[in-house]
């Protein structure tokens, strides 16, 4: 269905622009970020440049696997979104093009690759989300979990929602958060104690925030900005930034052998601009990477977070073995 949607969207775009005086080849994007953000950003890009855009929105795992499989004949020009370890994976497979944007100098070193194959455009921080009404109904008088270890309370069994790390970069980041803060042995002990308490492992990284917002679960592991957005929209949720959490960045990359390289470079430049990052923050409460961009009211500055020294390269190297172990041990 998604492939059909992408194809039909492309055909529709080509038909529309066939009648224009100047024909421009549409930029094709695989997007991991939310559809609302993707549409707003691509609409603004088209307005600023006149370059038409078509996009396919799907989960991180699905799109990164597609990028790698298509590396010799890419069906898109841009991979938009996804944590750094997934871009490292695609780069190691030879699927990404090197491009240093003029705006890359504004991006801090932790948010870009040394070889200019991927660049971060917003900071993502993992935390705990609470549906206040459901929590207080299920656990009257109980304090909200304030640390990662608090989630191991047996009372929470069935009331926790955590994304499936095999399908989602959000949950894989959580898995690595525990392995890196506790060490391999204690980290796996933690994860295997937590798993039986989880009521649902959806595939989409955005699902926990949504399920918390609708009151289907009391506690969830999610990016803080995703839960904060539901709070701003009037849902009965709270965000908690536990100590020793982890931060990462959503990245953008150009496909190796892109058929529309000039337009792809312009889109990377656009995504690193203050204008694009402020637009994204206004929609989804993400924290801009560009220091000239202002984050939306309600977004949590990086300076106020207790972050571990996250080893991105290690997370990427271990990905296959860690997910294999997860699949074997978590049913």
Please place each PLM-identified region on the residue numbering.
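Bacterial signal peptide processing site
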Residues: 21-23
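A bilobed periplasmic-binding-protein/Venus flytrap-type ligand-binding module shared by bacterial periplasmic
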Residues: 129-134, 249-260, 279-280
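Extracytoplasmic ligand-binding site segments that recognize negatively charged/polar headgroups
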Residues: 28, 32-39, 61, 75-216
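C-terminal motif of bacterial Sec signal peptides marking the signal peptidase cleavage site
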Residues: 16-19
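Short, polar/charged alpha-helical segment
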Residues: 32-54, 128, 230
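Periplasmic-binding protein-like
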Residues: 124, 156-163, 190-195, 201-202, 233-258, 271-293, ...
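A ligand-binding cleft/hinge motif common to bilobed small-molecule-binding domains
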Residues: 85-89, 213, 217-236, 284
């Amino acid at each position: 269905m998604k492939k059909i949607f992408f194809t039909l969207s492309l055909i529709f775009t080509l038909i529309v622009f066939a009648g224009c005086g100047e024909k421009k080849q549409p930029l094709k994007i695989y997007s991991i970020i939310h559809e609302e953000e993707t549409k707003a950003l691509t609409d603004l890009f088209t307005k600023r440049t006149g370059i038409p855009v078509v996009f396919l929105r799907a989960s991180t795992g699905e799109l990164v696997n597609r990028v790698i499989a298509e590396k010799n004949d890419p069906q898109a020009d841009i991979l938009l979104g996804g944590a750094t370890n997934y871009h490292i994976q695609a780069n190691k497979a030879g699927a990404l093009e090197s491009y240093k944007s003029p705006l890359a100098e504004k991006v801090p070193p932790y948010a870009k690759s040394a070889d200019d194959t991927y660049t971060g455009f917003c900071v993502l921080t993992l935390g705990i989300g609470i549906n206040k009404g459901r929590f207080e109904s299920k656990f009257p008088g109980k304090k909200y979990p304030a640390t990662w270890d608090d989630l191991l309370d047996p009372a929470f069994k069935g009331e926790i929602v955590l994304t499936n790390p095999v399908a989602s970069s959000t949950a894989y980041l959580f898995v690595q958060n525990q392995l890196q803060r506790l060490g391999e042995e204690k980290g796996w002990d933690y994860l295997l104690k937590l798993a039986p308490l989880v009521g649902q492992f959806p595939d989409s990284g955005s699902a926990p925030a949504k399920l918390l917002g609708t009151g289907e679960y009391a506690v969830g592991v999610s990016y803080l900005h995703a839960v904060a957005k539901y709070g701003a929209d009037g849902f009965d949720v709270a965000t908690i930034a536990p100590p020793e959490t982890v931060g990462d960045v959503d990245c953008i990359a150009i496909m190796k052998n892109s058929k529309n390289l000039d337009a792809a470079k312009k889109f990377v430049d656009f995504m690193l601009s203050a204008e694009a990052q402020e637009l994204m923050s206004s929609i989804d409460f993400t924290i801009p990477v560009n220091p000239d961009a202002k984050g939306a009211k309600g977004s949590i500055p990086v300076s106020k977070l207790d972050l571990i020294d996250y080893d991105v390269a290690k997370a990427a190297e271990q990905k296959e073995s860690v997910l294999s172990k997860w699949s074997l041990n978590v049913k």
